[in-house]
Protein backbone atom coordinates (compact mmCIF):
# COMPACT_ATOMS: atom_id res chain seq x y z
CA UNK A 1 0.00 0.00 0.00
CA UNK A 2 1.67 3.27 -1.04
CA UNK A 3 2.40 5.83 1.67
CA UNK A 4 0.20 8.88 1.36
CA UNK A 5 1.63 12.22 2.35
CA UNK A 6 -0.29 13.60 5.28
CA UNK A 7 -1.70 17.06 4.78
CA UNK A 8 -0.28 19.44 7.44
CA UNK A 9 -2.67 21.02 9.87
CA UNK A 10 -1.13 24.48 9.33
CA UNK A 11 0.43 25.50 6.03
CA UNK A 12 3.34 27.77 6.88
CA UNK A 13 3.37 29.45 3.48
CA UNK A 14 -0.27 30.52 3.74
CA UNK A 15 -0.40 30.96 7.51
CA UNK A 16 -0.81 34.35 9.17
CA UNK A 17 0.81 35.11 12.54
CA UNK A 18 -0.47 37.64 15.05
CA UNK A 19 0.96 39.38 18.12
CA UNK A 20 -1.32 39.84 21.12
CA UNK A 21 -0.75 43.46 22.21
CA UNK A 22 -2.54 46.03 24.36
CA UNK A 23 -5.05 48.28 22.69
CA UNK A 24 -3.72 51.74 21.86
CA UNK A 25 -4.65 54.65 24.12
CA UNK A 26 -5.73 56.56 21.02
CA UNK A 27 -8.24 53.85 20.15
CA UNK A 28 -11.81 55.01 20.97
CA UNK A 29 -12.65 51.50 22.21
CA UNK A 30 -9.98 51.73 24.95
CA UNK A 31 -12.59 53.31 27.26
CA UNK A 32 -15.23 50.71 26.37
CA UNK A 33 -15.46 48.09 29.12
CA UNK A 34 -17.19 45.58 26.85
CA UNK A 35 -14.43 45.71 24.21
CA UNK A 36 -11.34 43.55 24.81
CA UNK A 37 -8.29 45.47 26.00
CA UNK A 38 -5.89 43.29 23.98
CA UNK A 39 -5.98 43.08 20.20
CA UNK A 40 -4.28 41.05 17.49
CA UNK A 41 -1.52 42.69 15.50
CA UNK A 42 -0.49 40.89 12.27
CA UNK A 43 3.23 40.18 12.00
CA UNK A 44 5.21 41.35 9.02
CA UNK A 45 7.55 38.86 7.39
CA UNK A 46 10.94 40.35 6.68
CA UNK A 47 13.67 38.67 4.69
CA UNK A 48 16.69 38.03 6.94
CA UNK A 49 19.21 38.75 4.20
CA UNK A 50 17.62 42.08 3.35
CA UNK A 51 17.46 43.02 7.04
CA UNK A 52 21.14 42.13 7.61
CA UNK A 53 22.17 44.03 4.49
CA UNK A 54 20.27 47.06 5.77
CA UNK A 55 21.95 46.70 9.18
CA UNK A 56 25.41 46.66 7.62
CA UNK A 57 24.73 50.10 6.14
CA UNK A 58 24.50 51.49 9.68
CA UNK A 59 27.50 49.59 11.04
CA UNK A 60 25.65 46.69 12.71
CA UNK A 61 27.38 43.40 11.87
CA UNK A 62 25.73 41.02 14.38
CA UNK A 63 24.72 37.74 12.75
CA UNK A 64 21.58 36.89 14.68
CA UNK A 65 17.81 37.09 14.28
CA UNK A 66 17.36 40.27 16.35
CA UNK A 67 16.18 43.40 14.54
CA UNK A 68 18.62 46.17 15.55
CA UNK A 69 17.09 48.65 13.13
CA UNK A 70 14.16 49.26 15.44
CA UNK A 71 16.51 51.16 17.79
CA UNK A 72 17.74 53.42 14.98
CA UNK A 73 14.33 54.81 14.14
CA UNK A 74 13.32 58.20 15.47
CA UNK A 75 10.83 57.65 18.32
CA UNK A 76 9.08 60.98 17.65
CA UNK A 77 9.08 60.75 13.87
CA UNK A 78 5.92 60.32 11.78
CA UNK A 79 4.68 56.76 11.38
CA UNK A 80 2.77 55.38 8.44
CA UNK A 81 0.84 52.13 8.19
CA UNK A 82 2.14 50.13 5.20
CA UNK A 83 0.18 46.96 4.34
CA UNK A 84 2.24 43.79 4.15
CA UNK A 85 2.51 41.87 0.87
CA UNK A 86 2.27 38.44 2.53
CA UNK A 87 -1.32 38.87 3.63
CA UNK A 88 -4.27 41.04 2.83
CA UNK A 89 -5.74 43.64 5.14
CA UNK A 90 -8.95 42.58 6.83
CA UNK A 91 -12.02 43.60 4.88
CA UNK A 92 -14.37 44.70 7.62
CA UNK A 93 -17.63 46.52 7.39
CA UNK A 94 -18.92 48.78 10.09
CA UNK A 95 -22.15 46.86 10.24
CA UNK A 96 -20.63 43.38 10.00
CA UNK A 97 -18.98 41.77 12.99
CA UNK A 98 -16.66 39.16 11.38
CA UNK A 99 -13.52 40.14 9.39
CA UNK A 100 -12.30 37.97 6.50
CA UNK A 101 -8.70 37.61 5.27
CA UNK A 102 -8.85 37.11 1.53
CA UNK A 103 -5.59 35.12 1.35
CA UNK A 104 -6.49 32.53 3.98
CA UNK A 105 -10.23 32.85 4.41
CA UNK A 106 -9.95 33.31 8.18
CA UNK A 107 -13.04 34.80 9.79
CA UNK A 108 -12.38 36.73 13.00
CA UNK A 109 -14.58 39.26 14.81
CA UNK A 110 -13.68 42.91 14.35
CA UNK A 111 -13.44 43.44 18.11
CA UNK A 112 -10.19 41.46 18.25
CA UNK A 113 -8.50 44.02 15.98
CA UNK A 114 -7.63 47.66 16.59
CA UNK A 115 -9.98 50.36 15.35
CA UNK A 116 -9.35 51.84 11.95
CA UNK A 117 -9.64 55.43 13.16
CA UNK A 118 -7.61 56.75 16.10
CA UNK A 119 -7.76 60.00 18.03
CA UNK A 120 -4.94 62.53 18.03
CA UNK A 121 -4.54 62.55 21.83
CA UNK A 122 -4.59 59.45 24.00
CA UNK A 123 -6.82 58.90 27.00
CA UNK A 124 -3.95 59.16 29.49
CA UNK A 125 -2.82 62.51 28.12
CA UNK A 126 -6.38 63.80 28.24
CA UNK A 127 -6.82 62.78 31.86
CA UNK A 128 -3.37 63.97 32.97
CA UNK A 129 -3.56 67.20 34.98
CA UNK A 130 -1.69 70.21 33.66
CA UNK A 131 1.20 71.06 35.99
CA UNK A 132 2.72 74.47 36.35
CA UNK A 133 1.28 77.96 36.01
CA UNK A 134 -1.42 78.58 33.43
CA UNK A 135 -0.79 81.95 31.85
CA UNK A 136 -3.98 81.74 29.85
CA UNK A 137 -6.13 81.75 32.99
CA UNK A 138 -7.60 84.87 34.52
CA UNK A 139 -5.98 85.77 37.90
CA UNK A 140 -9.41 85.93 39.50
CA UNK A 141 -10.17 82.42 38.29
CA UNK A 142 -6.83 81.16 39.62
CA UNK A 143 -7.52 82.76 42.99
CA UNK A 144 -10.98 81.19 43.08
CA UNK A 145 -9.54 77.76 42.30
CA UNK A 146 -6.97 78.19 45.08
CA UNK A 147 -9.71 79.08 47.61
CA UNK A 148 -8.26 82.58 47.97
CA UNK A 149 -11.28 84.34 46.46
CA UNK A 150 -13.35 86.24 49.00
CA UNK A 151 -16.99 85.73 48.08
CA UNK A 152 -18.21 87.86 51.01
CA UNK A 153 -16.44 90.97 49.77
CA UNK A 154 -19.06 93.24 48.09
CA UNK A 155 -16.41 94.54 45.69
CA UNK A 156 -16.00 91.03 44.27
CA UNK A 157 -19.70 90.79 43.42
CA UNK A 158 -20.73 91.68 39.89
CA UNK A 159 -23.47 94.18 39.19
CA UNK A 160 -26.45 93.35 37.05
CA UNK A 161 -25.31 95.75 34.33
CA UNK A 162 -21.60 94.89 34.54
CA UNK A 163 -21.40 94.64 30.72
CA UNK A 164 -22.56 98.23 30.28
CA UNK A 165 -20.21 99.41 33.00
CA UNK A 166 -17.30 97.59 31.39
CA UNK A 167 -17.99 99.22 28.01
CA UNK A 168 -18.43 102.71 29.50
CA UNK A 169 -15.37 104.94 28.86
CA UNK A 170 -13.61 106.00 32.07
CA UNK A 171 -11.58 109.16 32.58
CA UNK A 172 -7.92 108.76 33.40
CA UNK A 173 -6.67 109.76 36.79
CA UNK A 174 -4.05 112.41 37.00
CA UNK A 175 -0.62 111.61 38.27
CA UNK A 176 0.60 112.70 41.68
CA UNK A 177 2.25 116.06 41.94
CA UNK A 178 5.43 114.57 43.37
CA UNK A 179 5.92 112.17 40.48
CA UNK A 180 5.18 114.98 38.01
CA UNK A 181 7.93 117.11 39.55
CA UNK A 182 10.46 114.25 39.50
CA UNK A 183 9.73 112.77 36.11
CA UNK A 184 8.03 115.66 34.34
CA UNK A 185 11.19 116.96 32.63
CA UNK A 186 11.56 113.87 30.51
CA UNK A 187 7.97 114.15 29.33
CA UNK A 188 8.06 117.92 28.79
CA UNK A 189 10.50 117.53 25.93
CA UNK A 190 8.35 114.83 24.43
CA UNK A 191 5.24 117.00 24.82
CA UNK A 192 6.93 119.87 23.04
CA UNK A 193 8.16 117.68 20.21
CA UNK A 194 4.85 115.89 19.79
CA UNK A 195 2.91 119.16 20.09
CA UNK A 196 5.03 120.82 17.45
CA UNK A 197 4.62 117.85 15.13
CA UNK A 198 0.87 117.83 15.65
CA UNK A 199 0.61 121.56 15.01
CA UNK A 200 2.75 121.37 11.93
CA UNK A 201 0.95 118.38 10.45
CA UNK A 202 -2.68 118.74 11.48
CA UNK A 203 -2.87 121.92 13.51
CA UNK A 204 -4.82 122.28 16.71
CA UNK A 205 -7.68 120.01 17.54
CA UNK A 206 -10.93 121.07 15.96
CA UNK A 207 -12.90 120.68 19.21
CA UNK A 208 -10.35 122.69 21.14
CA UNK A 209 -9.39 119.74 23.32
CA UNK A 210 -6.08 119.55 25.16
CA UNK A 211 -3.53 116.76 24.74
CA UNK A 212 -3.24 116.42 28.48
CA UNK A 213 -6.96 116.17 29.00
CA UNK A 214 -8.31 113.18 30.90
CA UNK A 215 -8.81 110.17 28.70
CA UNK A 216 -6.32 111.36 26.09
CA UNK A 217 -3.49 109.04 24.90
CA UNK A 218 -0.88 111.33 26.43
CA UNK A 219 -2.51 111.13 29.84
CA UNK A 220 -2.84 107.32 29.55
CA UNK A 221 0.86 107.06 28.67
CA UNK A 222 1.81 109.09 31.72
CA UNK A 223 -0.49 107.01 33.88
CA UNK A 224 1.14 103.68 33.03
CA UNK A 225 4.78 104.49 33.69
CA UNK A 226 7.13 101.56 34.03
CA UNK A 227 8.98 102.89 37.08
CA UNK A 228 5.69 103.67 38.77
CA UNK A 229 4.31 100.12 38.52
CA UNK A 230 7.41 97.97 38.95
CA UNK A 231 8.61 97.27 42.49
CA UNK A 232 11.80 95.29 43.01
CA UNK A 233 12.35 93.17 46.09
CA UNK A 234 15.52 92.90 48.13
CA UNK A 235 15.98 89.18 47.82
CA UNK A 236 15.24 88.62 44.13
CA UNK A 237 16.00 91.93 42.40
CA UNK A 238 13.12 91.07 40.07
CA UNK A 239 9.75 92.64 39.68
CA UNK A 240 7.06 91.47 42.04
CA UNK A 241 4.44 92.11 39.38
CA UNK A 242 6.15 89.64 37.09
CA UNK A 243 4.85 86.76 39.19
CA UNK A 244 2.38 84.50 37.45
CA UNK A 245 -0.14 84.41 40.28
CA UNK A 246 -1.70 87.43 41.86
CA UNK A 247 -0.28 88.33 45.28
CA UNK A 248 -2.89 87.52 47.89
CA UNK A 249 -2.72 88.36 51.60
CA UNK A 250 -0.60 85.37 52.58
CA UNK A 251 1.92 85.85 49.77
CA UNK A 252 2.13 89.55 50.57
CA UNK A 253 2.81 88.68 54.22
CA UNK A 254 5.65 86.36 53.15
CA UNK A 255 7.12 89.12 50.99
CA UNK A 256 7.06 91.60 53.87
CA UNK A 257 8.76 89.11 56.20
CA UNK A 258 11.54 88.52 53.68
CA UNK A 259 11.95 92.26 53.25
CA UNK A 260 12.35 92.72 57.02
CA UNK A 261 14.79 89.83 57.16
CA UNK A 262 17.02 91.18 54.38
CA UNK A 263 16.99 94.65 55.87
CA UNK A 264 19.32 93.29 58.56
CA UNK A 265 21.97 92.61 55.91
CA UNK A 266 22.06 96.09 54.43
CA UNK A 267 25.37 97.91 54.32
CA UNK A 268 24.23 100.26 57.05
CA UNK A 269 23.32 97.46 59.47
CA UNK A 270 26.54 95.47 59.06
CA UNK A 271 28.93 96.18 61.97
CA UNK A 272 32.70 96.11 62.21
CA UNK A 273 34.51 93.31 60.44
CA UNK A 274 36.41 90.57 62.23
CA UNK A 275 40.01 91.16 63.37
CA UNK A 276 39.51 94.90 63.16
CA UNK A 277 41.81 96.99 65.39
CA UNK A 278 39.71 99.03 67.80
CA UNK A 279 41.42 101.94 69.50
CA UNK A 280 40.20 104.05 72.39
CA UNK A 281 40.90 105.40 75.91
CA UNK A 282 39.61 104.48 79.36
CA UNK A 283 39.65 106.49 82.57
CA UNK A 284 41.89 105.42 85.45
CA UNK A 285 39.03 105.43 87.94
CA UNK A 286 36.75 103.45 85.63
CA UNK A 287 34.64 100.74 87.24
CA UNK A 288 35.38 98.38 84.36
CA UNK A 289 39.13 98.68 84.94
CA UNK A 290 38.66 98.08 88.69
CA UNK A 291 36.70 94.88 88.00
CA UNK A 292 39.44 93.57 85.73
CA UNK A 293 42.09 94.25 88.41
CA UNK A 294 40.03 92.52 91.09
CA UNK A 295 39.67 89.43 88.93
CA UNK A 296 43.43 89.41 88.35
CA UNK A 297 44.21 89.62 92.10
CA UNK A 298 41.76 86.83 92.85
CA UNK A 299 43.48 84.51 90.38
CA UNK A 300 46.89 85.28 91.91
CA UNK A 301 45.58 84.70 95.46
CA UNK A 302 44.23 81.30 94.51
CA UNK A 303 47.63 80.22 93.16
CA UNK A 304 49.50 81.37 96.31
CA UNK A 305 49.45 79.04 99.37
CA UNK A 306 50.69 80.10 102.81
CA UNK A 307 53.37 78.03 104.58
CA UNK A 308 51.27 77.73 107.74
CA UNK A 309 48.64 75.81 105.87
CA UNK A 310 51.20 73.39 104.42
CA UNK A 311 53.38 72.68 107.55
CA UNK A 312 51.72 73.31 110.91
CA UNK A 313 54.01 74.51 113.72
CA UNK A 314 55.36 71.50 115.66
CA UNK A 315 55.86 73.27 119.00
CA UNK A 316 52.48 74.89 119.18
CA UNK A 317 51.54 72.65 122.15
CA UNK A 318 54.52 73.90 124.23
CA UNK A 319 54.00 76.76 126.69
CA UNK A 320 55.04 80.14 125.57
CA UNK A 321 57.63 80.53 128.34
CA UNK A 322 59.61 77.55 127.09
CA UNK A 323 60.23 79.20 123.77
CA UNK A 324 63.60 80.78 123.36
CA UNK A 325 63.41 84.48 123.50
CA UNK A 326 66.27 84.74 121.08
CA UNK A 327 64.27 82.94 118.47
CA UNK A 328 61.94 85.15 116.57
CA UNK A 329 59.10 83.98 114.52
CA UNK A 330 59.46 84.83 110.92
CA UNK A 331 56.62 84.39 108.51
CA UNK A 332 57.81 83.45 105.04
CA UNK A 333 55.41 83.35 102.17
CA UNK A 334 56.27 80.58 99.76
CA UNK A 335 54.72 80.47 96.35
CA UNK A 336 54.23 76.91 95.17
CA UNK A 337 53.58 76.24 91.56
CA UNK A 338 51.16 73.56 90.61
CA UNK A 339 52.83 70.46 89.36
CA UNK A 340 52.31 70.10 85.67
CA UNK A 341 50.63 66.96 84.61
CA UNK A 342 52.98 64.79 82.62
CA UNK A 343 51.30 62.99 79.82
CA UNK A 344 52.43 59.76 78.32
CA UNK A 345 52.51 59.04 74.62
CA UNK A 346 49.06 57.48 74.62
CA UNK A 347 47.49 60.55 76.24
CA UNK A 348 49.22 62.91 73.81
CA UNK A 349 48.08 60.88 70.83
CA UNK A 350 44.54 60.91 72.15
CA UNK A 351 44.47 64.71 71.74
CA UNK A 352 44.89 64.30 68.00
CA UNK A 353 41.75 62.22 67.69
CA UNK A 354 39.00 63.47 65.44
CA UNK A 355 36.18 62.07 63.40
CA UNK A 356 38.49 60.01 61.17
CA UNK A 357 41.57 59.51 63.38
CA UNK A 358 41.30 57.32 66.49
CA UNK A 359 44.84 56.78 67.89
CA UNK A 360 45.31 54.03 70.43
CA UNK A 361 48.06 52.03 72.07
CA UNK A 362 49.76 49.52 69.77
CA UNK A 363 49.68 46.14 71.46
CA UNK A 364 52.23 43.42 70.75
CA UNK A 365 50.46 40.31 69.64
CA UNK A 366 52.51 37.14 69.25
CA UNK A 367 52.65 35.64 65.83
CA UNK A 368 50.10 32.86 65.49
CA UNK A 369 51.42 29.36 65.17
CA UNK A 370 51.82 28.28 61.59
CA UNK A 371 49.44 25.57 60.49
CA UNK A 372 51.02 22.60 58.75
CA UNK A 373 49.06 20.45 56.35
CA UNK A 374 49.42 16.74 55.93
CA UNK A 375 51.05 15.76 52.65
CA UNK A 376 48.82 12.68 52.35
CA UNK A 377 45.38 13.91 53.35
CA UNK A 378 45.75 17.71 53.22
CA UNK A 379 44.16 18.01 56.70
CA UNK A 380 45.81 20.43 59.18
CA UNK A 381 48.05 18.64 61.65
CA UNK A 382 47.73 18.90 65.46
CA UNK A 383 44.28 20.47 65.10
CA UNK A 384 41.85 17.60 65.29
CA UNK A 385 41.74 15.45 68.47
CA UNK A 386 43.74 12.25 68.41
CA UNK A 387 41.77 9.10 67.76
CA UNK A 388 41.98 5.96 69.91
CA UNK A 389 42.47 2.38 68.83
CA UNK A 390 40.07 0.96 66.30
CA UNK A 391 38.25 -2.36 66.69
CA UNK A 392 40.73 -4.11 64.38
CA UNK A 393 43.70 -2.78 66.31
CA UNK A 394 42.22 -4.01 69.60
CA UNK A 395 41.62 -7.44 68.06
CA UNK A 396 45.21 -7.63 66.84
CA UNK A 397 46.50 -6.67 70.28
CA UNK A 398 44.59 -9.57 71.80
CA UNK A 399 46.08 -12.03 69.26
CA UNK A 400 49.71 -11.27 70.20
CA UNK A 401 51.60 -14.31 71.57
CA UNK A 402 54.42 -14.42 74.05
CA UNK A 403 56.89 -15.06 71.27
CA UNK A 404 55.95 -11.79 69.62
CA UNK A 405 56.91 -9.78 72.71
CA UNK A 406 60.38 -8.24 72.83
CA UNK A 407 63.16 -10.40 74.24
CA UNK A 408 65.16 -9.63 77.30
CA UNK A 409 68.27 -9.01 75.23
CA UNK A 410 66.54 -6.31 73.28
CA UNK A 411 65.22 -4.46 76.33
CA UNK A 412 67.22 -1.45 77.53
CA UNK A 413 69.25 -1.81 80.71
CA UNK A 414 68.22 0.29 83.67
CA UNK A 415 70.81 2.61 85.22
CA UNK A 416 69.67 1.72 88.75
CA UNK A 417 70.17 -2.00 88.14
CA UNK A 418 71.56 -3.99 91.10
CA UNK A 419 73.97 -6.92 90.94
CA UNK A 420 71.21 -9.46 91.49
CA UNK A 421 69.17 -7.96 88.69
CA UNK A 422 72.20 -7.96 86.47
CA UNK A 423 72.90 -11.62 87.25
CA UNK A 424 69.30 -12.58 86.57
CA UNK A 425 69.29 -10.60 83.32
CA UNK A 426 72.41 -12.31 82.05
CA UNK A 427 71.05 -15.72 82.98
CA UNK A 428 67.84 -14.97 81.07
CA UNK A 429 69.86 -13.88 78.05
CA UNK A 430 71.81 -17.16 78.13
CA UNK A 431 68.61 -19.18 78.26
CA UNK A 432 67.14 -17.21 75.34
CA UNK A 433 70.27 -17.80 73.28
CA UNK A 434 70.19 -21.49 74.12
CA UNK A 435 66.56 -21.74 73.07
CA UNK A 436 67.41 -19.85 69.92
CA UNK A 437 70.19 -22.31 69.06
CA UNK A 438 67.92 -25.30 69.60
CA UNK A 439 65.22 -23.67 67.47
CA UNK A 440 67.73 -22.83 64.76
CA UNK A 441 69.04 -26.42 64.71
CA UNK A 442 65.53 -27.82 64.45
CA UNK A 443 64.72 -25.45 61.59
CA UNK A 444 67.84 -26.51 59.68
CA UNK A 445 66.96 -30.17 60.10
CA UNK A 446 63.39 -29.55 58.96
CA UNK A 447 64.60 -27.65 55.88
CA UNK A 448 67.00 -30.51 54.98
CA UNK A 449 64.28 -33.12 55.21
CA UNK A 450 61.91 -30.98 53.14
CA UNK A 451 64.60 -30.45 50.52
CA UNK A 452 65.26 -34.18 50.20
CA UNK A 453 61.56 -34.92 49.87
CA UNK A 454 61.09 -32.36 47.11
CA UNK A 455 64.17 -33.68 45.23
CA UNK A 456 62.76 -37.20 45.30
CA UNK A 457 59.43 -36.01 43.97
CA UNK A 458 61.12 -34.19 41.11
CA UNK A 459 63.18 -37.26 40.26
CA UNK A 460 60.13 -39.53 40.22
CA UNK A 461 58.25 -36.96 38.12
CA UNK A 462 60.99 -36.90 35.51
CA UNK A 463 61.10 -40.70 35.29
CA UNK A 464 57.36 -40.91 34.87
CA UNK A 465 57.39 -38.31 32.11
CA UNK A 466 60.12 -40.16 30.23
CA UNK A 467 58.21 -43.46 30.47
CA UNK A 468 55.14 -41.90 28.98
CA UNK A 469 56.88 -40.67 25.82
CA UNK A 470 56.11 -42.74 22.67
Swiss-Prot record:
Pfam families for the chain: LTV
Q: Where is this region: Disordered?
A: 25-53, 162-222, 400-437
Record keywords, A-Z: Coiled coil, Phosphoprotein, Ribosome biogenesis
Q: Does the keyword Coiled coil apply?
A: yes
Compositionally biased tracts (Basic and acidic residues):
413-437
The UniProt entry's GO biological process terms, in alphabetical order, are:
ribosomal small subunit biogenesis; ribosome biogenesis
Q: Which residues carry this modification: Phosphoserine?
A: 17, 24, 243, 326, 403
Task: List the record's Gene Ontology CC terms alphabetically.
Answer: cytosol; nucleoplasm
Q: Which residues form a coiled coil?
A: 414-470
Positions with biased composition (Acidic residues): 178-196
User: Domain of life of the organism in this record?
Assistant: Eukaryota
Protein's job: Essential for ribosome biogenesis.
UniProt cross-references to PANTHER family, sorted A to Z: LOW-TEMPERATURE VIABILITY PROTEIN LTV1-RELATED, PROTEIN LTV1 HOMOLOG
Q: Which family does it belong to?
A: Belongs to the LTV1 family.
Protein name listed in UniProt: Protein LTV1 homolog
Amino acid sequence: MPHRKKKPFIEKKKAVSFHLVHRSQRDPLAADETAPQRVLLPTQKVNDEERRAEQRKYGVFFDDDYDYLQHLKEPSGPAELIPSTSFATPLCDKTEDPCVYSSTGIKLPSSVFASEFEEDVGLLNKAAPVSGPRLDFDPDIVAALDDDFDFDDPENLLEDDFILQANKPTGGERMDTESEEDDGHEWEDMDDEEGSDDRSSAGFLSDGGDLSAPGSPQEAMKKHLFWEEETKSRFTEYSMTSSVMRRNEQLTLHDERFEKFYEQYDDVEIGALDNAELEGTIQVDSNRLQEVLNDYYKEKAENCVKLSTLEPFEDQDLPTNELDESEKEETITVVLEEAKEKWDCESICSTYSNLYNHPQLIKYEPKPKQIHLSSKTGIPLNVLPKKGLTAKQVERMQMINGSDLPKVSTQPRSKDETKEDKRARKQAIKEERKERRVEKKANKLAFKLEKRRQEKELLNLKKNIEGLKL
